[in-house]
């Protein structure tokens, strides 16, 4: 854990801790690899880590280690879904995460993540798990 001013940082590396090939929106979109979708990322990885954060903790999410690219459906469902399904407001989510990368090409994906979160409407949809 890294200590920054006022916050303890917990790390999550998408390429190492989730998948080097994340894709798709819903588990039902990918019957052969439902564990690599945005829905799986949000429900099985991101949401539990966010819920486990203390008041003085943030989640540092590394997006470029071992991952070549991201589709918009994965990013939207994986990140903005936290807001859309009412788990956190966009302000709460943005205050709890920091998107990190070392490859400057991934600045584009960071901007897309922040854009999707900003556009998400809080609790605009009820989450119903998709079937594979």
Model-found features: residue ranges?
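Amphipathic alpha-helical interaction surfaces in cytosolic regulatory modules
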Residues: 17-43, 49-59, 63-110
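Short amphipathic
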Residues: 9-17
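Short glycine-/polar-rich loops that comprise or flank the Walker A/P-loop
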Residues: 8-10, 94-95
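Extended, charge-rich low-complexity interaction segments
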Residues: 122-132
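Short, Lys/Arg-enriched N-terminal segments with co-localized hydrophobic residues
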Residues: 1-8
């Amino acid at each position: 854990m890294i200590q920054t001013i006022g916050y303890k940082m917990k790390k999550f590396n998408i390429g190492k801790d989730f998948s080097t090939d994340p894709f798709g929106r819903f588990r039902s979109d990918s019957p052969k690899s439902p564990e690599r979708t945005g829905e799986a990322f949000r429900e099985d990885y991101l949401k539990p880590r966010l819920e486990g954060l203390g008041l003085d903790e943030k989640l540092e999410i590394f997006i470029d280690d071992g991952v070549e690219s991201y589709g918009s459906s994965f990013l939207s469902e994986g990140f903005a879904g936290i807001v859309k399904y009412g788990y956190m407001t966009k302000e709460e989510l943005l205050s709890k995460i920091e998107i990190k990368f070392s490859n400057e090409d991934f600045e584009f994906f960071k901007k897309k993540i922040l854009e999707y979160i900003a556009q998400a409407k809080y609790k605009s949809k009820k989450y119903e798990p998709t079937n594979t």
